[in-house]
């Protein structure tokens, strides 16, 4: 789609406003809305000025002017606003150089794709994330000097089987780890998920599947067709936006938080990925799991740099409450065909053109631009340096003898450990100027503040363990 096409859409659909969107460092969508009458072809060359100092982890107030540069290919109508509004995703551009801002996540993702092409290894990287989420009826939390708490509720939750309702208790509910995946009325979110899928398709995505997930209390998943790196990261933001707003319209609240419930499965973002060149899938071969040597080396790079990748792929303190044994979360850095206890799975496919790997440890607190770019850079490092991942692990990794378990590397056990790993293992990310040391340092500082805030906060469980000592 070209700027002329966008202007034609504005005319045909009688668009009143254009919503300029971008992702901050944390991956949260930000937006500023302008009248459609202010958008012309020059807007796609000159952009729109804005104050970058208000975005956490970006510029100081003394050098705050930045440019939102709309990408015409991302134009899509917003399905939620009252007035006809067109969404345009933007890159963040430095006014002095008119180049992508080095801390802009989308610009980093673009540089990763460009670097991949410059190596000659591949011309296409495909990503297919599976974003899991919960749908709750009520959520409350507080954290201040007088105390801290959180409370979630869902009419579907197993803990409500004994609750007295004015109109009677519906009775049909998935229990703990019982949501995957009985038909309605046990699955009470069929119609809501379908409404979400309808919205996603109206916004240009190709929905492949939707279903209830394992956990009680409304855990769900919507599968969307894979896409190239930057386009798929764009789609992840649109998917989260659509899911949360459709839930809101139904009087519900949706969250992609990795571990909102204690004692049941958390929300992951398993990321399927593959490389191609001249239309040929480079991951398809005749080695283990139908993989090529290139794919095995890509896996080797992911495993080698996994702890640094955790900083981008599991980008919250809450992420590491999910990455524990016993809840289908992959903590072992191993690969296997069809074995979901390994952190990297090779899905079974009939068509070699669909051959891919699935990296299972990420979650949706990741900024998709940064996470996908970082995984691509790790995989390329594995290919360039012929890093073999070792033998596949086809046994149940959740039930290993202690001596075998110790021999297998694991993902980080905390966010601060992941940030330390990123600080020490960053060279593979800075090749080709994809990530810069300045960006990584700013990310470490921003995320370190989250670690410090939680570390300094008294937790209710501490009262349970220590109050009476």
From Swiss-Prot:
What does the cofactor field's note say?
Answer: Binds 2 Mg(2+) ions per subunit.
Q: What is its EC number?
A: 6.3.1.2
- Keywords attached to this entry: ATP-binding, Cytoplasm, Ligase, Magnesium, Metal-binding, Nucleotide-binding, Phosphoprotein
Q: Which residues bind ATP?
A: 208, 272-274, 340, 345, 353
**A Pfam entry, by short name:** Gln-synt_C
Any idea where the GS catalytic domain is?
105-469
Q: What top-level class of enzyme does the UniProt entry assign?
A: ligase
Where in the cell is the protein located? Cytoplasm
What is the regulation of this protein's activity? The activity of this enzyme could be controlled by adenylation under conditions of abundant glutamine.
Q: Which family does it belong to?
A: Belongs to the glutamine synthetase family.
Q: What is this protein called?
A: Glutamine synthetase
Lineage per the UniProt record: Bacteria, Pseudomonadati, Pseudomonadota, Gammaproteobacteria, Methylococcales
